[in-house]
């Protein structure tokens, strides 16, 4: 019996479905029993008093209708639903979630109308659960919960930093475009430190060639010498950068560089904390045995997955990452095979960048990747294939509590 059939069977055996449409201040609940009896949608506040009222309503219905099992489901939502979810974790219920995309599509089948209301949505969610199209809700606890929060925070800060760097790039392009060519961008510490002290061509000319060479060599710790200094000095003398409004531009450049420095420091603090919490995860050492997989990557994966023991097979965890394959074919038309991208996007991103490390020379997936390329697969698709294989490997090591052994089959045969 497949998993979907099992889920449908569970719902049909003296089970009550409670579906919730999560809101910012108020939630809408709905109850449906296995025998068809239902309690029409009702509102309850998103606070402790509202949670108690909701639970009392469920408990009364359970006693009246002699219910053996309660399934409470909601859409995969934002932070609004987290307090309610944590309140229900200690209750004798099964918590499940449904894909918002499924809700959007099924609601038209409900009454042949695209109408969306707070009273209609929980009924649609209940329908989806009754069809067996629900997923178990996995809530990280302890160190895993800390890692998820830290990893999400790190992603947001990196996104903000990227936006700042793009703004800085456009400003420098206006007043000193040649700098970007000679220094090959502004992301490096050398570029940022030099810009902080000498942001304009006039600043470099006033400093003088010899001093530019010394300053550049010191800032870059010997990476850039007098050859770069000469090119930079000549570029400053012949720069086509604008002069008008430069004072305002320099004020913004100073602010952005300070912000980038501050965010770099905060990212370092986050990563330090992530490494500390990773030590509290017993199976993390098995994942770190994979060459090319470092502590921050493992922390991010564990934070997104939670507990590997909650997943029964590799297929389930592949689906969580949105790396499960699908195609759209009809008649003689053969569709392209693609990944669904319906799982956790940060997990998928972490695996993709991890794949770039494990395909390097002497990496654990180097041969596998190049075999795919030699067989005509595009590089990006090959990296996605490596991501899938890497996640299956990580799942196996975590579940079996084993260290990675390169060329295991060859060594075991020796």
What is the predicted function of each stretch?
Residues 1-414:
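A detector of single, family-specific signature residues
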């Amino acid at each position: 019996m497949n998993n979907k059939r099992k889920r449908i069977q569970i719902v049909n055996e003296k089970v009550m479905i409670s579906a919730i449409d999560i809101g910012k201040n108020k939630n809408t609940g709905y109850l449906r029993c296995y025998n068809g009896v239902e309690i029409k949608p009702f509102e309850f506040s998103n606070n402790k008093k509202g949670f108690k009222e909701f639970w009392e309503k469920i408990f009364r219905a359970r006693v009246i209708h002699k219910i053996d099992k309660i399934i409470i489901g909601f859409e995969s939502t934002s932070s609004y639903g987290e307090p309610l979810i944590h309140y229900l974790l200690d209750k004798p219920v099964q918590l499940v979630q449904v894909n918002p995309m499924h809700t959007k599509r099924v609601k038209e089948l409900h009454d042949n109308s695209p109408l969306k209301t707070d009273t209609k949505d929980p009924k649609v969610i209940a329908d989806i659960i009754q069809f067996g199209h629900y997923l178990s809700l996995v809530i990280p606890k302890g160190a895993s919960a800390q890692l998820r929060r830290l990893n999400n925070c790190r992603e947001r800060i990196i996104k903000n930093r990227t936006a700042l760097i793009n703004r800085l790039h456009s400003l420098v392009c206006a007043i000193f475009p040649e700098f970007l060519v000679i220094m090959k961008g502004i992301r490096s510490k050398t570029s940022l430190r030099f810009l902080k002290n000498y942001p304009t061509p006039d600043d470099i000319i006033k400093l003088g060639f010899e001093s530019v060479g010394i300053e550049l060599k010191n800032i870059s710790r010997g990476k850039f010498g007098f050859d770069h200094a000469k090119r930079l000095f000549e570029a400053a003398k012949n720069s086509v950068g604008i002069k008008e409004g430069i004072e305002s531009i320099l004020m913004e450049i100073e602010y952005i560089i300070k912000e980038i420095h501050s965010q770099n420091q905060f990212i370092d603090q986050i990563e330090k904390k992530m490494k500390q919490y990773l030590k509290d995860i017993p199976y993390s050492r098995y994942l770190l045995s994979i060459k090319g997989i470092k502590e921050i990557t493992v922390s991010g994966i564990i934070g997104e997955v939670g507990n590997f023991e909650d997943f029964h097979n590799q297929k389930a965890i592949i689906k969580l990452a949105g790396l499960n394959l699908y195609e759209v074919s009809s008649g003689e038309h053969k569709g392209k095979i693609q990944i669904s991208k319906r799982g956790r996007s940060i997990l998928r991103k972490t695996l993709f960048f991890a794949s770039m490390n494990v395909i390097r020379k002497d990496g654990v997936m180097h041969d596998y990747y190049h075999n795919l390329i030699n067989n005509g697969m595009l590089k990006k698709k090959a990296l996605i294939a490596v991501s899938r294989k890497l996640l299956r490997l990580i799942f196996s090591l975590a579940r079996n509590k084993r260290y990675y052994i390169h060329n295991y089959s060859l060594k075991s045969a020796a």
